[in-house]
């Protein structure tokens, strides 16, 4: 059965983190729904690149995915964190034991800020872990704690994406390894 991932974007998201993740998932035949958490599918990234999402979260808020991913970006994570629909969507996926994948500031500013880590280990960028009490910060590039996968930031985007892929495609590790080798990524 094909795995499905939702990528949650809001104005101000870190485009490099999002695009690398989406690319790796799609190379591995994982279905990706890029969902805008704003009122429109047209989004402006952290560095003012205009990107269109596939649809809005409001049209998919009752759907379940195998994983939910959030990139960083200061304003993007502020927008995600302040959106009650995003928090409810994440809570439903946590309760359903789905993968929650947070890159860069989203680990702290979305998950920890809304008490969604519940003591789990995670990593985040920029010293943001000092602002929130929820979760246990681990100073590593990528941290996996059960169904929670977090990465420090843009520089670890490939490692993060392949970590998520390996978790989702447990029966297809050779495919994941081949794709990593094919793009000259050592993991």
Predicted regions and their residues:
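Short N-terminal binding/cap micro-motifs at the start of the first secondary-structure element
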Residues: 13-17, 42
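Short glycine/proline-centered loop/turn elements that form peptide/ligand docking sites
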Residues: 19, 36-39
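Short, solvent-exposed amphipathic alpha-helices that sit
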Residues: 17-27
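Short acidic-hydrophobic surface loop/beta-edge motif
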Residues: 41-45, 140-143
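Active-site-adjacent pocket-lining segments in enzyme domains
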Residues: 4-7, 11-13, 26-36, 53-55, ...
